[in-house]
């Protein structure tokens, strides 16, 4: 069963594998603790080894206006309260690519994305427009949070935010914790779904599209109480972790919206 699950999510962590297998264990009348499953996976060589990588894509030395961080002490309590945006590097044998992502800070659902062979603002705008088109709660007040990269400070990008009534927040320094959700989602896509080292740009786009779909609709999120981002996006009254320096306590009372 683990091998079948790994065909869809090759590097899914052990805790999430255990959670995903609970219905199967129940159907078979089996009981398997997390530590026991870890032992089985370790003996079979199925535990995932994480590797760290970092390629800087933020270019914050530019002439555009830089906005303040207005979510620093905010409590993220609902979907479409805060979106986080970031750009991550993707390697192919043809050329270097850059993946622009817009993620909901509450549900961790990837709302919009765009893959490009350059760092121009147009690519980030396409990801943003996709996210806006995918809004489930268009009447809710929304804050867009990002680093101080020139793409997000560009007047053309700001114009799209203003047109849609979206407030702007930016990091104050180059600190991963100030945009922790975006950094974490980048890591999940690379570490668990292996979205790098492709042969061609066409292959990269095809496999990244599949990976994002699997991430949104199938992958359980620890910080979402093992809900998928798609399901978490529809929850209310559930205080989720936001990958800050101090995680908030979770209120286990749920209501589906």
Locate each region found by the language model.
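Active-site beta-loop-alpha junctions of metal-dependent nucleic acid enzymes
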Residues: 95, 114-137
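C-terminal domain-tail junction helix/linker
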Residues: 162-166, 188-257
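Mobile genetic element proteins and their domesticated derivatives, centered on retroelements
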Residues: 1-2, 17, 21, 37, ...
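An active-site-proximal beta-strand-loop segment
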Residues: 76-111, 117
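Short small-residue beta-strand/loop micro-motif enriched in glycine and branched aliphatics
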Residues: 109-113, 169-171, 195
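Basic, flexible linker segments flanking DNA-binding modules
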Residues: 1-79, 232-237
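Conserved, non-catalytic sequence blocks in retroelement Pol enzymes and Pol-derived host proteins
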Residues: 11, 30, 75-77, 92, ...
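RNase H-like two-metal-ion nuclease catalytic core shared by retroviral integrases
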Residues: 58-60, 146-148, 154-158, 168-190, ...
């Amino acid at each position: 069963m683990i091998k079948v699950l790994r065909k869809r999510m090759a590097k899914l962590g052990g805790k999430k594998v255990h959670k995903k297998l609970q219905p199967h264990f129940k159907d078979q009348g089996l009981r398997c603790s997390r530590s026991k499953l870890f032992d089985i996976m370790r003996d079979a060589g199925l535990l995932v080894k994480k590797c760290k990588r970092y390629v800087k894509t933020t270019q914050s030395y530019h002439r555009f206006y830089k906005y303040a961080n207005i979510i620093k002490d905010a409590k993220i309590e609902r979907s479409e309260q805060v979106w986080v945006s970031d750009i991550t590097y993707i390697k192919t044998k043809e050329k270097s690519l850059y993946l622009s992502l817009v993620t909901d800070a509450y549900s961790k659902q990837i709302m919009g994305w765009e893959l490009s062979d350059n760092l121009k603002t147009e690519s980030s705008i396409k990801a943003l427009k996709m996210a806006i088109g995918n809004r489930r709660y268009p009447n809710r007040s929304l804050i867009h949070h990002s680093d101080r990269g020139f793409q997000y400070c560009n007047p053309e990008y700001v114009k799209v935010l203003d047109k849609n009534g979206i407030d702007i927040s930016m990091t104050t320094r180059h600190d991963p914790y100030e945009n922790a959700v975006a950094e974490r989602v980048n890591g999940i896509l690379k570490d668990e779904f292996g979205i790098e080292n492709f042969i061609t740009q066409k292959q990269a786009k095809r496999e990244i599209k599949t990976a994002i779909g699997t991430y949104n609709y199938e992958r359980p999120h620890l910080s979402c109480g093992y809900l998928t981002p798609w399901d978490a996006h529809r929850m209310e009254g559930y205080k989720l972790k936001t990958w800050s320096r101090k995680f908030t306590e979770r209120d286990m009372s749920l209501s589906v919206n």
